[in-house]
Amino acid sequence: MTVRLHASLETVLGRLGAEFGEQLTYPGIYRGSRLNVAPVLVEREGVSTVVISEADSDACRVMVPGVGKSVYGRYFDWDKDMAAPVRTFAQAVRDIAGDGTILCEAALPLVRYQALAESGPVELFGMPEPRPLFVYAKKRGEIEAQWLATRDADAAAFAPFVATLRDGARLVDAMTASARGFGPLDALCTEKGFPALYITAPHEVEMFTGLPARAVEQQGMGVLFRPGEAEITIHAEKPILRGDFRHVGTCAGLAQALGNCSHDVIAIQKDHISVGEFASLAQTGIRFEDAAYVIRRWQDRRAGDDAVYFFFAANAVLKGIDAARAFFARNAEGEITERDLVAAYHQGVSRFARHYGFADRVGSYFDIVHSGARTLLPATAGDYPVRVSDRTIKFDMGLTVSDAFGCIRGVSDIARTICAEAEIEALHDRLRNILIDELIPAIRPGMSGAQVHEIGVDLLRPLEAEFRRLGLLPEGKGVDGYLRDCGHTIQRQTISSVYFLPGVGEKVENGMLGCTEYVWPIGDILIAVEDGYLVTPEGGIAFTVEGEG
């Protein structure tokens, strides 16, 4: 009996349908490690089963018929037993495959493969052929200069709007206050004992080349970063015919390229590099560590350098949601779908972008729009109807903002809810006011994720009776049961190093950016509010509140 696991999105979506792919949320959110969160397809005795995270599982409604479903992970809602054990990816696969050998596609990310191999025997198919590489060097100072030149120009263009925000004068200053560049990454590598990093995800390689991810992907680039060195080494499958990339040689493949670099230890992106690609590196004798934390922490620490892009993205979302609300109100008696609301939202975003010189530089990496009656999971907007009778319609919107060279410099993660009932709307607005007036100002450098979560839950206590009166707390549960995050830091993708959750010891630092949020899912009600903040020594400053600067 042969059990096959297909990992490439091309194969999985080819089998399960394009509409299924369009409804997936998390492969878009995890821009640097899509396949580490994407569904996989397991075939056993002629039966196909998709293995998918619960957060993305609403997409299974539209996959082709005749395919089974195995779900792992857990997404918070009040009706679940959050103390129950959480099923892992490997368990979900083994529940289908059994204890025997799994024939696994070599495209699976290394970290997923390692978890699967710990659960039982695994063999690989579809191994990649070695690819010759062109080797280049680029001065990191040139990349940092590109960052500053584009940042300063965009900050000047957007300053008139930022000045209108509450605390606008401080926020305007913050847009050009720091230029940390690669410095924090040097320090993190030294702290962790990493003499070199090898970066493979196009989303991350952008920041080491000054080229947009699409160009990185087309050229087949990876980069070798050595802390403190003036040049970054770039490996490319195709020639790079640019004067700022100095050609220094060629090599037969990645194993030779890394083997030649004289390092005993190299940190790699284990959540991105495929097990097939990694298999070729065994002959090098190098010990490969995981670079995920160092990359995320660096991006968190340098996000303040690019504050203008985060300020723009967050406020563009709010303008878009305003446009969608107005469209919904005008057409409330007609037939409207979630995608109609998204179209109206993007029109509002585009108007805002054109006004401040960001036209053609704004993209979407998630559009979560749906009623609480449709699902409590973070589902991408689809062809589902929305009606005035829907008690809540959630918007949780992710935009990317690029600089003039096409490199993504900032993103949004902002949420609001259309509420049909006055009491629910009042509660939504109260939660939002708690975020911007109480929780965000309480965030200070040196606080852990657990400490911020504790404050966030404490601020909910005065509302507990109101939640209960409105039927928004199950019998026997109180606000202490709010085990969802109250927010997180943010960088060039939503995935970051600090989440405001119980048990998280990682700390926020001065100059970091992030989002605070409350998401309240129960029954057919889904209330979501989320606002952006900048960490300062005096406390956090919200950058999504209009008012006198």
Q: Where are these predicted regions, by residue range?
A:
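Active-site neighborhoods and metal-handling regions in enzymes and metal-associated proteins
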Residues: 1-549
